[in-house]
Amino acid sequence: MGENYALELRDISKSFGSVQANDHVDLTLRKSEILAILGENGSGKTTLMNMIYGIYYPDEGHIFVNGKEVTIRSPKDSYELGIGMVHQHFKLVDVLTAAENIVLGLPGKRKLDMKRITEDIQKLADKYGFELNLSQKIYEMSVSQKQTVEIIKMLYRGARILILDEPTAVLTPQESDRLFDILRNMRKDGCSIMIITHKLQEVLALSDRVAILRKGKYIDTVETAQANAQSLSEMMVGGRVDLNIDRPEPENVKKRLVVKGLNCKNKEEVKTLDDVDLTVNAGEILGIAGISGSGQKEFLEAIAGLQAIESGSITLLDDNGKGTELAGMDSISINKAGISLAFVPEDRIGMGLVGDMDMTDNMMLRSYRNGKSPFLDRKGPKALALKIKEQLEVMTPSISAPVRQMSGGNVQKVLVGREIAQNPKVLLVAFPTRGVDVNTSHVIYRLLNEQKKKGVAVVCVIEDLDVVRELCDRIAVFCGGKISGIEDGRTATKEEIGLLMTKHEKGGTQA
């Protein structure tokens, strides 16, 4: 055991039934380093991190912290060993302040000296360069501020080993840069950091070393300075990967969807869309960018009939320019009317697919929604399930297995495959590659481009600004429920889009 290792895993294995999630994995984390963990969906990254954090317990193997073998059976054990984990979905209480969330659940006296505690937390925040109002309620915060609370919470509890799961998934470029500066400050102070991410450019910019997993097995750990995006992706998938994203020129562009004066409110009567005007063309991919909660999700759901509309119009135009008004129609009415619209929601299992159903039954959901008899011939849906499994290389033991057992990337392939099989005129896709590995991401990009070439109007909410600029013809940027600008995907910079996402407007046009 090297004495400079903060953490070492030896021969770690974990299975769930017949599925081998981790297969005799060895891994080391040095003191004062940032280690990136890379792997395709289903490679075992999250399972491995969850064993370090105490959510799962390994079937075999040994874990060492600072040279001593340890047993971690719960997050409480990991806290006591100085290990903290910030999950992609934050675990905060919205009605409490930042300071209250940070101390929530700590052992000690019932009555806390919050003035002294707040001063201590502020010193910790200042030490690493965090910017945070400790008296602010969580529900008043941006996503990046909530993430800051989670990180400080772990540091305040004594974490010197920090695990971050997809830390930049919903951050702007400027927020990501600030986070990286903070993580570098933590490294200088002796913290050891592990990051799970699919963004290769961030791995290359931030990490000291990169560990690669493939199908549950440990492949290698390489020095970041000696790696590049191509070499890392090839180790992840075991073969050559084309990292280029095609963007064919739009052909026969015509108006397909015209949105005017669209206003929506949520259940709390808070405005989520504020007088939105947008035209979507057939034969193009329109990207929707914005900080999480800026109205992108509500915009797609309003078009799909899943969001109540306060006012405004959504007009679907046919090839002759004749319009059908969608405003006021729910999703069932849209399907019954035979309107050719497909929607891939953010919530893949729940809103998109039923986790306990197999692929065939999930193909049949379309028929149920159309109001047809549930006593259907399963031959057609089964054939479609087999076609999607084969053509999109869906990794599943069988099309009869519940989709809940699949990795996120394979679930997304099934969902996208089912929706495009409807031959839609309009395809709405929310976060098509969120949490999806590089290989699966490029499968999704290819499918979207195929729809574009067929003349489909494709609308995508995309959080990765590199991808939105490479894939999309136009980019509509949402900020606070409004469109702050529309940019040409071929000429827009990340900085310009990032500024529009945070209300610093640069002139954009709809042309």
Model-predicted segments: where are they?
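Glycine-rich phosphate-binding loops of nucleotide-dependent enzymes
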Residues: G2-A511
